[in-house]
Protein backbone atom coordinates (compact mmCIF):
# COMPACT_ATOMS: atom_id res chain seq x y z
CA UNK A 1 0.00 0.00 0.00
CA UNK A 2 2.92 2.48 0.42
CA UNK A 3 3.01 4.99 -2.44
CA UNK A 4 -0.41 4.11 -3.84
CA UNK A 5 -2.46 6.15 -6.31
CA UNK A 6 -6.20 6.50 -6.90
CA UNK A 7 -8.46 7.46 -9.81
CA UNK A 8 -11.90 8.86 -8.93
CA UNK A 9 -14.47 9.12 -11.72
CA UNK A 10 -17.33 11.58 -11.34
CA UNK A 11 -14.93 13.59 -9.20
CA UNK A 12 -16.73 16.86 -9.86
CA UNK A 13 -20.00 15.51 -8.48
CA UNK A 14 -21.66 15.84 -5.08
CA UNK A 15 -20.10 12.66 -3.65
CA UNK A 16 -16.96 12.65 -5.79
CA UNK A 17 -15.75 15.99 -4.44
CA UNK A 18 -16.00 14.73 -0.83
CA UNK A 19 -14.07 11.59 -1.71
CA UNK A 20 -11.27 13.68 -3.25
CA UNK A 21 -11.06 15.91 -0.15
CA UNK A 22 -10.74 12.85 2.08
CA UNK A 23 -8.29 11.02 -0.15
CA UNK A 24 -5.69 13.80 -0.01
CA UNK A 25 -5.55 13.24 3.76
CA UNK A 26 -4.38 9.63 3.27
CA UNK A 27 -0.76 9.40 4.45
CA UNK A 28 0.58 6.94 1.86
CA UNK A 29 -1.31 8.33 -1.15
CA UNK A 30 1.04 9.80 -3.75
CA UNK A 31 -1.44 10.87 -6.42
CA UNK A 32 -5.18 11.22 -6.83
CA UNK A 33 -6.57 11.66 -10.34
CA UNK A 34 -9.92 13.41 -10.53
CA UNK A 35 -11.81 12.51 -13.72
CA UNK A 36 -15.08 14.00 -14.94
CA UNK A 37 -16.59 15.03 -18.25
CA UNK A 38 -16.48 18.72 -17.31
CA UNK A 39 -15.38 20.49 -14.13
CA UNK A 40 -16.87 23.75 -12.95
CA UNK A 41 -14.16 26.45 -12.61
CA UNK A 42 -14.74 26.69 -8.84
CA UNK A 43 -14.34 22.91 -8.43
CA UNK A 44 -11.12 22.88 -10.44
CA UNK A 45 -9.83 25.80 -8.34
CA UNK A 46 -10.73 23.99 -5.11
CA UNK A 47 -8.89 20.85 -6.22
CA UNK A 48 -5.82 22.93 -7.07
CA UNK A 49 -5.84 24.32 -3.53
CA UNK A 50 -5.80 20.75 -2.19
CA UNK A 51 -2.28 20.26 -3.56
CA UNK A 52 -0.37 19.14 -0.48
CA UNK A 53 2.04 16.21 -0.37
CA UNK A 54 -0.52 14.34 -2.47
CA UNK A 55 -0.50 15.28 -6.14
CA UNK A 56 -3.98 16.12 -7.46
CA UNK A 57 -4.35 15.70 -11.22
CA UNK A 58 -7.56 17.00 -12.80
CA UNK A 59 -8.60 15.16 -15.98
CA UNK A 60 -11.53 15.96 -18.25
CA UNK A 61 -12.78 13.07 -20.34
CA UNK A 62 -15.75 10.95 -21.29
CA UNK A 63 -16.52 7.66 -19.52
CA UNK A 64 -17.45 6.31 -22.98
CA UNK A 65 -13.99 7.11 -24.39
CA UNK A 66 -12.02 3.87 -23.96
CA UNK A 67 -8.67 5.46 -24.85
CA UNK A 68 -9.21 8.26 -22.34
CA UNK A 69 -9.97 5.72 -19.60
CA UNK A 70 -6.94 3.63 -20.42
CA UNK A 71 -4.67 6.68 -20.13
CA UNK A 72 -6.34 7.73 -16.88
CA UNK A 73 -5.79 4.25 -15.38
CA UNK A 74 -2.07 3.98 -16.17
CA UNK A 75 -0.05 3.53 -12.98
CA UNK A 76 -3.16 3.57 -10.74
CA UNK A 77 -3.58 1.33 -7.68
CA UNK A 78 -7.30 1.86 -6.97
CA UNK A 79 -10.27 3.07 -9.03
CA UNK A 80 -13.29 4.57 -7.26
CA UNK A 81 -16.07 4.75 -9.85
CA UNK A 82 -18.76 7.26 -8.83
CA UNK A 83 -19.58 8.66 -12.30
CA UNK A 84 -23.23 8.10 -13.24
CA UNK A 85 -26.24 9.60 -14.96
CA UNK A 86 -28.77 9.91 -12.13
CA UNK A 87 -32.36 10.37 -13.25
CA UNK A 88 -35.62 9.02 -11.82
CA UNK A 89 -37.78 11.66 -13.52
CA UNK A 90 -37.37 10.55 -17.14
CA UNK A 91 -35.55 13.73 -18.15
CA UNK A 92 -32.54 11.99 -19.75
CA UNK A 93 -32.98 9.66 -22.77
CA UNK A 94 -33.00 5.99 -21.77
CA UNK A 95 -30.09 5.00 -24.00
CA UNK A 96 -27.92 7.84 -22.66
CA UNK A 97 -28.40 6.61 -19.08
CA UNK A 98 -27.65 3.00 -20.01
CA UNK A 99 -24.58 4.02 -22.04
CA UNK A 100 -23.09 6.08 -19.20
CA UNK A 101 -23.98 3.80 -16.31
CA UNK A 102 -23.51 0.37 -17.86
CA UNK A 103 -21.31 0.73 -20.94
CA UNK A 104 -19.14 3.30 -19.13
CA UNK A 105 -18.60 0.89 -16.25
CA UNK A 106 -17.71 -1.95 -18.63
CA UNK A 107 -15.24 0.37 -20.41
CA UNK A 108 -13.63 1.27 -17.09
CA UNK A 109 -13.34 -2.37 -16.00
CA UNK A 110 -11.61 -3.19 -19.29
CA UNK A 111 -9.27 -0.20 -18.85
CA UNK A 112 -8.37 -1.54 -15.39
CA UNK A 113 -7.52 -4.95 -16.85
CA UNK A 114 -5.36 -3.42 -19.60
CA UNK A 115 -3.61 -1.00 -17.19
CA UNK A 116 -3.30 -3.70 -14.47
CA UNK A 117 -5.23 -1.79 -11.79
CA UNK A 118 -5.71 -4.26 -8.90
CA UNK A 119 -8.63 -2.66 -6.99
CA UNK A 120 -12.01 -1.34 -8.18
CA UNK A 121 -14.72 0.19 -5.97
CA UNK A 122 -18.12 0.84 -7.52
CA UNK A 123 -20.57 3.40 -6.18
CA UNK A 124 -23.83 1.56 -6.65
CA UNK A 125 -27.21 2.71 -5.31
CA UNK A 126 -29.97 1.62 -2.97
CA UNK A 127 -32.12 1.66 -6.13
CA UNK A 128 -30.58 -1.65 -7.25
CA UNK A 129 -32.36 -3.31 -4.30
CA UNK A 130 -35.78 -1.75 -4.92
CA UNK A 131 -38.32 -1.00 -3.62
CA UNK A 132 -40.46 -2.83 -6.18
CA UNK A 133 -43.83 -1.99 -4.61
CA UNK A 134 -45.08 0.82 -2.38
CA UNK A 135 -46.61 -1.94 -0.24
CA UNK A 136 -43.18 -3.47 0.40
CA UNK A 137 -41.79 -3.03 3.93
CA UNK A 138 -38.08 -3.47 4.66
CA UNK A 139 -36.80 -2.31 8.06
CA UNK A 140 -33.07 -2.58 8.76
CA UNK A 141 -32.53 -4.84 5.78
CA UNK A 142 -29.15 -6.47 5.22
CA UNK A 143 -27.00 -8.03 2.52
CA UNK A 144 -27.98 -11.64 3.23
CA UNK A 145 -31.58 -10.87 2.25
CA UNK A 146 -32.56 -11.09 -1.42
CA UNK A 147 -33.53 -7.59 -2.53
CA UNK A 148 -33.26 -6.82 -6.25
CA UNK A 149 -34.98 -4.15 -8.31
CA UNK A 150 -37.34 -5.45 -10.99
CA UNK A 151 -37.91 -2.00 -12.54
CA UNK A 152 -37.12 -1.59 -16.24
CA UNK A 153 -36.65 2.18 -15.76
CA UNK A 154 -33.17 3.07 -17.05
CA UNK A 155 -31.57 4.29 -13.81
CA UNK A 156 -32.25 1.30 -11.50
CA UNK A 157 -31.80 -1.14 -14.39
CA UNK A 158 -28.44 0.28 -15.53
CA UNK A 159 -27.07 0.56 -11.98
CA UNK A 160 -28.15 -3.01 -11.20
CA UNK A 161 -26.52 -4.42 -14.33
CA UNK A 162 -23.35 -2.37 -13.79
CA UNK A 163 -23.06 -3.60 -10.20
CA UNK A 164 -23.46 -7.21 -11.37
CA UNK A 165 -20.68 -6.65 -13.93
CA UNK A 166 -18.36 -5.16 -11.30
CA UNK A 167 -18.86 -8.01 -8.84
CA UNK A 168 -18.55 -10.62 -11.61
CA UNK A 169 -15.22 -9.04 -12.62
CA UNK A 170 -13.73 -9.85 -9.21
CA UNK A 171 -10.88 -12.29 -9.71
CA UNK A 172 -10.26 -11.29 -13.35
CA UNK A 173 -6.69 -11.62 -14.62
CA UNK A 174 -4.83 -8.38 -15.25
CA UNK A 175 -2.45 -7.78 -18.14
CA UNK A 176 0.57 -7.95 -15.83
CA UNK A 177 -0.56 -11.31 -14.42
CA UNK A 178 -2.09 -9.86 -11.28
CA UNK A 179 -5.71 -10.14 -10.14
CA UNK A 180 -8.51 -7.56 -10.09
CA UNK A 181 -10.42 -7.27 -6.81
CA UNK A 182 -13.75 -5.45 -6.76
CA UNK A 183 -16.54 -4.44 -4.39
CA UNK A 184 -19.66 -2.27 -4.55
CA UNK A 185 -21.14 0.21 -2.08
CA UNK A 186 -24.89 0.87 -2.00
CA UNK A 187 -25.44 4.22 -0.26
CA UNK A 188 -28.89 5.21 0.91
CA UNK A 189 -30.29 8.55 -0.34
CA UNK A 190 -27.32 10.93 0.16
CA UNK A 191 -27.95 14.36 1.69
CA UNK A 192 -25.71 17.22 2.77
CA UNK A 193 -24.32 20.55 1.64
CA UNK A 194 -24.44 21.07 -2.14
CA UNK A 195 -26.90 18.22 -2.70
CA UNK A 196 -28.38 18.80 -6.18
CA UNK A 197 -31.75 17.30 -5.20
CA UNK A 198 -32.03 19.37 -2.01
CA UNK A 199 -31.01 22.49 -3.97
CA UNK A 200 -33.90 21.98 -6.39
CA UNK A 201 -36.34 21.36 -3.51
CA UNK A 202 -35.28 24.48 -1.58
CA UNK A 203 -35.22 26.81 -4.57
CA UNK A 204 -38.68 25.63 -5.60
CA UNK A 205 -39.94 26.25 -2.05
CA UNK A 206 -38.47 29.77 -1.94
CA UNK A 207 -40.26 30.57 -5.19
CA UNK A 208 -43.47 29.13 -3.71
CA UNK A 209 -43.68 31.39 -0.63
CA UNK A 210 -41.60 29.02 1.50
CA UNK A 211 -43.84 25.99 0.98
CA UNK A 212 -42.03 22.68 0.50
CA UNK A 213 -43.38 20.13 -1.96
CA UNK A 214 -44.93 17.08 -0.29
CA UNK A 215 -43.96 14.04 -2.35
CA UNK A 216 -42.87 11.35 0.09
CA UNK A 217 -44.73 11.66 3.37
CA UNK A 218 -45.61 7.93 3.40
CA UNK A 219 -41.98 6.80 3.18
CA UNK A 220 -39.64 5.64 5.93
CA UNK A 221 -36.00 5.77 4.88
CA UNK A 222 -32.58 6.19 6.49
CA UNK A 223 -30.64 8.75 4.44
CA UNK A 224 -26.86 8.96 4.74
CA UNK A 225 -24.81 12.15 5.16
CA UNK A 226 -22.46 12.77 2.24
CA UNK A 227 -19.27 12.78 4.35
CA UNK A 228 -20.17 9.39 5.79
CA UNK A 229 -20.86 7.96 2.33
CA UNK A 230 -17.48 9.30 1.16
CA UNK A 231 -15.74 7.85 4.23
CA UNK A 232 -17.04 4.36 3.38
CA UNK A 233 -15.27 4.63 0.00
CA UNK A 234 -11.97 5.53 1.67
CA UNK A 235 -12.28 2.51 3.97
CA UNK A 236 -13.10 0.25 1.00
CA UNK A 237 -9.99 1.54 -0.81
CA UNK A 238 -7.88 0.77 2.24
CA UNK A 239 -9.53 -2.60 2.77
CA UNK A 240 -9.05 -3.94 -0.76
CA UNK A 241 -5.32 -3.16 -0.44
CA UNK A 242 -4.98 -4.79 2.99
CA UNK A 243 -3.99 -8.49 2.66
CA UNK A 244 -5.80 -9.29 5.93
CA UNK A 245 -9.08 -7.52 5.12
CA UNK A 246 -9.24 -7.90 1.34
CA UNK A 247 -10.38 -11.57 1.15
CA UNK A 248 -13.58 -10.71 3.04
CA UNK A 249 -14.32 -7.65 0.86
CA UNK A 250 -13.60 -9.04 -2.62
CA UNK A 251 -16.74 -9.52 -4.71
CA UNK A 252 -19.02 -8.15 -1.98
CA UNK A 253 -21.58 -5.34 -1.85
CA UNK A 254 -22.36 -3.18 1.19
CA UNK A 255 -25.29 -1.02 2.25
CA UNK A 256 -24.00 2.33 3.48
CA UNK A 257 -26.14 4.23 5.97
CA UNK A 258 -25.39 6.09 9.21
CA UNK A 259 -27.19 7.24 12.36
CA UNK A 260 -29.55 9.68 10.65
CA UNK A 261 -33.01 8.98 12.15
CA UNK A 262 -35.43 6.88 10.12
CA UNK A 263 -37.96 9.32 8.66
CA UNK A 264 -39.85 10.26 5.51
CA UNK A 265 -38.24 12.26 2.72
CA UNK A 266 -40.67 15.10 3.47
CA UNK A 267 -39.75 15.10 7.16
CA UNK A 268 -36.05 15.20 6.27
CA UNK A 269 -36.54 18.23 4.00
CA UNK A 270 -38.55 19.99 6.71
CA UNK A 271 -36.11 19.23 9.55
CA UNK A 272 -33.19 20.49 7.47
CA UNK A 273 -34.93 23.70 6.37
CA UNK A 274 -37.36 24.70 9.15
CA UNK A 275 -34.86 27.13 10.74
CA UNK A 276 -35.21 29.25 7.60
CA UNK A 277 -39.00 29.51 7.65
CA UNK A 278 -39.77 26.77 5.14
CA UNK A 279 -42.76 24.55 5.85
CA UNK A 280 -44.47 21.55 4.21
CA UNK A 281 -47.50 21.93 1.98
CA UNK A 282 -50.57 21.23 4.13
CA UNK A 283 -53.01 20.90 1.25
CA UNK A 284 -54.75 17.61 0.46
CA UNK A 285 -52.57 14.88 -1.02
CA UNK A 286 -53.99 11.96 -3.03
CA UNK A 287 -53.46 8.47 -1.55
CA UNK A 288 -50.44 6.54 -2.83
CA UNK A 289 -52.54 4.02 -4.77
CA UNK A 290 -54.16 6.84 -6.75
CA UNK A 291 -50.79 8.52 -7.39
CA UNK A 292 -49.41 5.21 -8.63
CA UNK A 293 -52.16 4.77 -11.21
CA UNK A 294 -51.95 8.42 -12.23
CA UNK A 295 -48.25 7.76 -12.80
CA UNK A 296 -49.16 4.82 -15.03
CA UNK A 297 -51.56 6.99 -17.08
CA UNK A 298 -48.93 9.72 -17.46
CA UNK A 299 -46.39 7.13 -18.63
CA UNK A 300 -48.95 5.85 -21.15
CA UNK A 301 -49.56 9.37 -22.49
CA UNK A 302 -45.79 9.89 -22.79
CA UNK A 303 -45.43 6.61 -24.70
CA UNK A 304 -48.29 7.40 -27.11
CA UNK A 305 -46.97 10.90 -27.81
CA UNK A 306 -43.36 9.80 -28.29
CA UNK A 307 -43.48 9.62 -32.14
CA UNK A 308 -44.53 13.28 -32.37
CA UNK A 309 -43.70 14.92 -29.02
CA UNK A 310 -41.29 14.28 -26.14
CA UNK A 311 -43.63 14.60 -23.15
CA UNK A 312 -41.93 14.28 -19.74
CA UNK A 313 -44.46 13.36 -17.02
CA UNK A 314 -44.16 15.22 -13.68
CA UNK A 315 -43.93 11.83 -11.97
CA UNK A 316 -44.07 8.11 -12.75
CA UNK A 317 -44.77 4.82 -10.97
CA UNK A 318 -41.13 4.27 -10.08
CA UNK A 319 -40.85 7.71 -8.46
CA UNK A 320 -44.12 7.24 -6.54
CA UNK A 321 -42.85 3.90 -5.23
CA UNK A 322 -39.41 5.27 -4.29
CA UNK A 323 -40.97 8.20 -2.45
CA UNK A 324 -43.63 6.32 -0.48
CA UNK A 325 -42.15 3.05 0.76
CA UNK A 326 -40.74 1.79 4.07
CA UNK A 327 -37.19 0.87 2.98
CA UNK A 328 -34.27 1.08 5.45
CA UNK A 329 -30.97 -0.81 5.67
CA UNK A 330 -28.31 -1.55 8.27
CA UNK A 331 -24.59 -0.82 7.85
CA UNK A 332 -23.46 -3.72 10.10
CA UNK A 333 -21.73 -5.65 7.30
CA UNK A 334 -19.70 -2.55 6.33
CA UNK A 335 -18.92 -2.11 10.02
CA UNK A 336 -17.65 -5.70 10.23
CA UNK A 337 -15.64 -5.93 6.98
CA UNK A 338 -14.58 -2.33 6.30
CA UNK A 339 -14.35 -1.06 9.88
CA UNK A 340 -16.96 1.54 8.92
CA UNK A 341 -18.31 3.89 11.58
CA UNK A 342 -20.01 7.16 10.61
CA UNK A 343 -17.55 10.07 10.89
CA UNK A 344 -20.30 12.64 11.40
CA UNK A 345 -23.25 12.29 13.77
CA UNK A 346 -26.83 13.29 12.96
CA UNK A 347 -26.82 16.60 14.84
CA UNK A 348 -23.65 17.83 13.17
CA UNK A 349 -24.86 16.63 9.76
CA UNK A 350 -28.19 18.40 10.29
CA UNK A 351 -26.50 21.65 11.38
CA UNK A 352 -24.05 21.63 8.47
CA UNK A 353 -26.80 20.99 5.93
CA UNK A 354 -29.19 23.50 7.50
CA UNK A 355 -26.53 26.22 7.47
CA UNK A 356 -25.92 25.64 3.77
CA UNK A 357 -29.68 25.67 3.10
CA UNK A 358 -29.83 29.03 4.89
CA UNK A 359 -27.29 30.50 2.46
CA UNK A 360 -29.30 29.05 -0.43
CA UNK A 361 -32.53 30.60 0.88
CA UNK A 362 -30.90 34.02 1.30
CA UNK A 363 -29.32 33.85 -2.15
CA UNK A 364 -32.58 33.02 -3.91
CA UNK A 365 -34.69 35.38 -1.82
CA UNK A 366 -32.35 38.08 -3.07
CA UNK A 367 -32.86 36.89 -6.64
CA UNK A 368 -36.65 37.07 -6.22
CA UNK A 369 -36.43 40.55 -4.69
CA UNK A 370 -34.29 41.73 -7.59
CA UNK A 371 -36.80 40.33 -10.10
CA UNK A 372 -39.69 41.96 -8.24
CA UNK A 373 -38.01 45.35 -8.48
Curated annotation (Swiss-Prot):
Subcellular location: Endoplasmic reticulum membrane; Mitochondrion membrane
UniProtKB keywords: Endoplasmic reticulum, Isomerase, Lipid metabolism, Membrane, Mitochondrion, Multifunctional enzyme, NAD, NADP, Oxidoreductase, Steroid metabolism, Steroidogenesis, Transmembrane, Transmembrane helix
GO annotation, biological process: steroid biosynthetic process
Pathway: Steroid hormone biosynthesis; Steroid metabolism
Tissue-specific expression: High levels in adrenal gland, kidney and male liver. Low levels in female liver.
CC annotations in GO: endoplasmic reticulum membrane; mitochondrial membrane
Pfam hit, one: 3Beta_HSD
Biological role stated in the UniProt entry: A bifunctional enzyme responsible for the oxidation and isomerization of 3beta-hydroxy-Delta(5)-steroid precursors to 3-oxo-Delta(4)-steroids, an essential step in steroid hormone biosynthesis. Specifically catalyzes the conversion of pregnenolone to progesterone, 17alpha-hydroxypregnenolone to 17alpha-hydroxyprogesterone, dehydroepiandrosterone (DHEA) to 4-androstenedione, and androstenediol to testosterone. Additionally, catalyzes the interconversion between 3beta-hydroxy and 3-oxo-5alpha-androstane steroids controlling the bioavalability of the active forms.
Protein name: 3 beta-hydroxysteroid dehydrogenase/Delta 5-->4-isomerase type 1
Recorded name of the encoding gene: HSD3B1
Amino acid sequence: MPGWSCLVTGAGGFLGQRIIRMLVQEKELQEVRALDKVFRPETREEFCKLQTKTKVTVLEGDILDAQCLRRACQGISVVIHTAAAIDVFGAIPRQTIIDINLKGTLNLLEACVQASVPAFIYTSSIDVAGPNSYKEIVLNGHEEQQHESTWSDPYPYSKKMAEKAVLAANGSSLKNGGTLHTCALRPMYIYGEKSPLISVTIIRAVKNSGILDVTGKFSTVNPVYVNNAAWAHILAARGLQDPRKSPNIQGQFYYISDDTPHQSYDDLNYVLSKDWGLRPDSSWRPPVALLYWLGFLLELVSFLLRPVYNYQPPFNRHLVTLSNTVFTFSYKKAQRDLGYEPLVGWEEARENTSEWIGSLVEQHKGTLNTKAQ
